[in-house]
Regions:
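Peripheral, non-AAA+ core regions of ATP-driven protein-machinery
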Residues: 4-215
Length: 215
């Protein structure tokens, strides 16, 4: 019986990987920050078990509704993330000053256009987990008050109804992914300080963090 022989060592080029072995897979392109600052648009952050991370764009806008601040959610959001949306709406509305909220209610009574539509683009990518809670809260608050959110900022952190922000996982992957997307300012939970310190120690001699701010 005749067998094929294999020449060792085997040389595999980047071209082979991309166009031969992985030709049926789509190349991942990091999501970029918005072109400009705007009301109701914020950068959340994600990380997964595959060692990847990046930006989750979160958008909030009004839509016609007979119920004040009725939520409409789109963008393939999981159950945990949907719960975060509900918590965020309750918290954000409690943070808005009385005069502004009164004006929103008066506007609703006239227009019936104050339902809140929250959308996470890239609908083909499933999104779940509570770590976007803080970003969603800020996004809804921005919509209710008409205040712009800086387009270069990204925020991560689980949040409860009292406004306490708690720890999240994968901070290092989220920061690295955010940097690829153009983020220059990160906001993260105090409970993740050790993760942050470890990250800074690892990259302290790298120009990667030049002019990058953390809060």
């Amino acid at each position: 019986q005749k067998y094929d022989t294999i020449q060792l060592p085997i040389t595999v080029s980047n071209h082979d990987i991309k166009y031969k072995y992985l030709k049926d897979y789509h190349e991942y392109n990091p999501k970029k920050i918005p072109i400009q600052s705007a009301v109701g648009i914020i950068n959340g952050l994600w990380a997964n078990s595959m060692g990847q991370g990046g930006i989750i764009p979160i958008e909030a806008s009004y839509f016609p509704s007979t119920s004040f601040m009725e939520l409409k959610l789109t963008g393939l959001q999981g159950d945990v993330m949907k719960e975060s949306m509900t918590v965020a709406k309750t918290l954000a509305s409690s943070l808005v000053d009385t005069d502004t909220m009164t004006k929103n209610i008066e506007r609703f009574e006239k227009t019936k256009n104050q339902g809140i539509h929250i959308h996470c683009p890239e609908g083909s990518v499933p999104k779940d987990g509570p770590s976007a809670g803080t970003a969603i809260t800020c996004c809804i608050y921005s919509l209710l008050t008409g205040r712009n959110i800086k387009n270069n900022i990204a925020i991560t952190g689980e949040i409860n109804l009292q406004g306490y922000v708690t720890a999240i996982g994968g901070l290092n992957l989220k920061i690295l992914g955010g940097l690829k997307g153009g983020v220059t300012e990160f906001i993260f939970p105090k409970e993740n300080k050790k993760d942050y310190d470890d990250f800074i120690e690892l990259y302290k001699d790298n120009n990667l963090l030049l002019n990058i701010r953390f809060h």
